[in-house]
């Protein structure tokens, strides 16, 4: 391994993109157990639970679907992170095995460039609104600072809270996995306290019976419950399309495959059991108690009389947003941007570039057209499902779990593998799978497929790539060789 690292350094690759040595792979089971809790318990996910009630499913069906989703998510995170934990290599480099050295740039930029940066900016803005609530609870006069002053549509209090929250997120991004790990270790028990406490509060207010009987006003019980049950699972799993693609950005730090597999599985299942119970109890209980459908946990917290309880709950919600932003957005963006010019850019350069772009896009302006921006991001997310299918089929079926690192860390300008650095089979399969999974958003008769788009994209891409891809002497990327 040390000989390989020196060779790759001579080719110009930065330390951040090199394979991790065994001594650098320090993450154990507990590190992975705590990693994703904040990504499960955040404001958009709780709002999503409210959307599930609109489908007309029972409370029990929604809870069961959410819990089952955890097993699908864990399986994909573990399997697509297997190469990372075996070779200590980040996603940006692993992607080269299946799409080619040059071809990897397109799906990589979709994930680490466009989607990650836009979501980073949007999450920073959403978090700044919670931050505004937090400061306003303590210092009401803060909300009127600056009078009518605005900058690019933001009031002075809004601008201050956005910049504060943005800087905190950027700081976590610069710290990378080490800082994130310490942060999530603190966050986890706080999540149990806040969301577990909110669930108990809701049950104590209205009782468990009414919660299980809850149906939003004007909604009829679903007739095609079986398909809608699958739609709920797809919706929960699809949220993880981007993190699952870049799972190797975190599994590269794993001490072993077993530890990342056990840690991620236990962490996600436990997190989603709590989320399933807390989500339906909080949303249904609050809606019954306040006499109106209330699906945003921030709206619920603002109604509380206790200043301390409100302050602590909003603080933890802010922390979950930071955790989600780090694991899902800024860290993958940092690695992917560094991979665009591996001889010139480092991970921290990538974080800085992504952070600045997230400011320049003015996310508060994007939120003025929420439907359009979320449709755009949903389409990008839908493209990543097929990428997962191709990556897993290539690694497990075509290459049988073996990667030739020398062919991933080629010298600049060396595109001898695949067709001038592009795996055309991977791109063809991805295109077909994307059309099948997202076509329903534009073509009416395909609409049922789009409601389970993640499953369609992953399964079609995996099966098609595994069947079409043949190992030839011309295309051997991923074969294990001895490097002299």
From Swiss-Prot:
Record bears the keyword Membrane: yes
InterPro entries given in the database record: NCS1, Pur-cyt_permease, Uracil/uridine/allantoin_perm
The reaction(s) this protein catalyses: (S)-allantoin(in) + H(+)(in) = (S)-allantoin(out) + H(+)(out)
Pfam families found in the cross-reference section: Transp_cyt_pur
GO molecular function, one term: nucleobase transmembrane transporter activity
Protein's name according to its UniProt entry: Putative allantoin permease
Family: Belongs to the purine-cytosine permease (2.A.39) family.
Localisation: Cell inner membrane
Role this protein plays: Uptake of allantoin into the cell.
GO annotations of cellular component type: plasma membrane
Domain of life: Bacteria
Topological category with respect to the lipid bilayer: Multi-pass membrane protein
Segments passing through the bilayer: 35-55, 59-79, 114-134, 156-176, 191-211, 225-245, 266-286, 307-327, 347-367, 373-393, 426-446, 448-468
Induction profile: By glyoxylate.
Organism of derivation: Escherichia coli (strain K12)
Keywords, comma-separated and alphabetical: Cell inner membrane, Cell membrane, Membrane, Purine metabolism, Symport, Transmembrane, Transmembrane helix, Transport
């Amino acid at each position: 391994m040390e000989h390989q690292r020196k060779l790759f350094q001579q080719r110009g690759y930065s330390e951040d993109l090199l394979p991790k040595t065994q001594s650098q792979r320090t993450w154990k089971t507990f590190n992975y157990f705590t990693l994703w809790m904040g990504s499960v318990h955040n404001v958009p996910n709780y709002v999503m639970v409210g959307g599930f009630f609109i489908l007309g499913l029972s409370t029990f069906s929604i809870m069961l679907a959410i819990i089952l989703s955890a097993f699908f998510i864990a399986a994909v995170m573990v399997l697509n992170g297997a190469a990372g934990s075996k070779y200590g290599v980040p996603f940006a480099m692993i992607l080269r095995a299946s799409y080619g050295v040059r071809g990897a740039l397109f799906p990589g930029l979709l994930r680490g460039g466009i989607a990650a940066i836009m979501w980073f900016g949007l999450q920073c803005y959403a978090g700044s609104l919670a931050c505004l609530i937090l400061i306003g609870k303590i210092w009401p006069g803060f909300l009127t600072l600056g009078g009518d002053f605005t900058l690019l549509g933001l009031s002075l209090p809004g601008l201050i809270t956005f910049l504060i929250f943005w800087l905190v997120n950027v700081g976590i991004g610069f710290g990378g996995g080490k800082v994130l790990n310490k942060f999530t270790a603190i966050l986890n028990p706080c999540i149990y306290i806040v969301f577990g406490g909110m669930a108990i509060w809701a049950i104590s207010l209205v009782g468990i019976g009414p919660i299980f009987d809850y149906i939003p006003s004007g909604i009829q019980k679903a007739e095609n419950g079986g398909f809608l049950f699958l739609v709920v699972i797809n919706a929960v799993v699809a949220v993880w399309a981007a993190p699952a693609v870049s799972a190797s950005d975190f599994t590269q730090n794993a001490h072993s495959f077993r530890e990342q597999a056990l840690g991620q599985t236990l962490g996600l299942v436990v997190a989603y059991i709590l989320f399933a119970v807390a989500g339906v109890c909080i949303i249904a209980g609050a809606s019954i108690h306040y006499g109106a459908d209330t699906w945003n946990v921030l709206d619920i917290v603002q109604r509380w009389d206790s200043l301390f309880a409100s302050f602590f709950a909003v603080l933890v919600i802010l922390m979950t947003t930071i955790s989600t932003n780090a694991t899902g957005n800024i860290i993958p963006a940092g690695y992917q941007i560094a991979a665009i010019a591996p001889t010139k850019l480092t991970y921290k350069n990538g974080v800085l570039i992504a952070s600045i772009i997230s400011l320049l896009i003015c996310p508060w302006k994007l939120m003025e057209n929420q439907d359009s921006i979320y449709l755009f991001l949903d389409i990008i997310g839908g493209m990543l499902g097929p990428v997962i299918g191709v990556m897993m089929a290539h690694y497990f079926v075509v290459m049988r779990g073996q990667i030739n690192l020398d062919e991933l860390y080629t010298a600049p300008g060396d595109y001898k593998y695949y067709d001038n650095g592009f795996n055309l089979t991977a791109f063809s399969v991805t295109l077909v799978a994307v059309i099948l999974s997202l076509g329903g958003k534009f073509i009416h008769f395909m609409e049922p497929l789009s409601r389970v788009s993640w499953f369609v994209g992953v399964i079609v891409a995996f099966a098609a790539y595994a069947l079409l891809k043949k190992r030839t002497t011309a295309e051997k990327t991923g074969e294990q060789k001895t490097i002299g």
